[in-house]
């Protein structure tokens, strides 16, 4: 059976792939359900961006500061309900959760799962340090993009692997494509897309 990954992305799906997109598109023999922040696709059902990978925009919900406990919990309960409905629709049972930001700690109690990955690619100065500590503690494995992030997270988890940011080198080093016959007789410059 296929492995199931439920990814909480802190960035929307883009034509120029982010770190999270690069990682999720490389999952082999897997189904990936990636949740992006609310945006222009919030009212649409999930969009299949490639075989085995569906992107769903989270619904816009009223955000509340943590000090407003009732509203804060309500915010994450509403997100959890939406995510569980999507899981049911896509037949996800107990996926591996792939978290990319400290705030995702609040979704762990809302979503059934069999394990947690925290992929940390940056510092989060505007999110509570406690959230990140709790997420790192809850994670079965932490991927960190730099040695500094490993040092920062190592008090909370001893299963940390360095996964540096990088470039998809083959994508940028392809040989130039052969000019189609219908364009060979045209003088330059040739503009198009």
Predicted regions and their residues:
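Carbohydrate-associated surface elements
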Residues: 148, 166, 175
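Active-site proximal beta-strand in glycosyltransferases
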Residues: 32, 96-99, 109-124
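N-terminal subdomain of nucleotide-sugar transferases
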Residues: 1-44
């Amino acid at each position: 059976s296929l492995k199931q990954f439920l990814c909480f992305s802190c960035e929307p799906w883009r034509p120029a792939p982010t770190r999270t997109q690069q990682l999720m598109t490389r999952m082999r023999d897997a189904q990936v359900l990636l949740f992006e922040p609310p945006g222009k696709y919030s009212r649409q059902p999930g969009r299949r961006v490639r075989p085995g990978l569906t992107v769903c925009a989270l619904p816009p919900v009223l955000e509340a500061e943590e000090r407003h406990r009732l509203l804060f919990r309500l915010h994450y309960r509403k997100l959890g309900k939406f995510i569980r409905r999507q899981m049911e629709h896509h037949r996800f049972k107990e996926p591996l959760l792939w978290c990319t930001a400290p705030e995702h700690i609040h979704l762990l109690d809302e979503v059934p799962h069999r394990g947690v990955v925290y992929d940390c690619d940056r510092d989060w100065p505007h999110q509570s340090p406690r959230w990140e500590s709790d997420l790192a503690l809850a994670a079965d494995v932490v991927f960190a993009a730099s040695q500094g992030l490993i040092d920062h997270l190592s008090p909370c988890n001893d299963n940390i692997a360095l996964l540096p940011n990088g470039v998809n080198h083959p994508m940028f080093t392809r040989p130039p494509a052969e000019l189609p016959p219908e364009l060979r007789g045209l003088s330059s410059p040739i503009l198009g897309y």
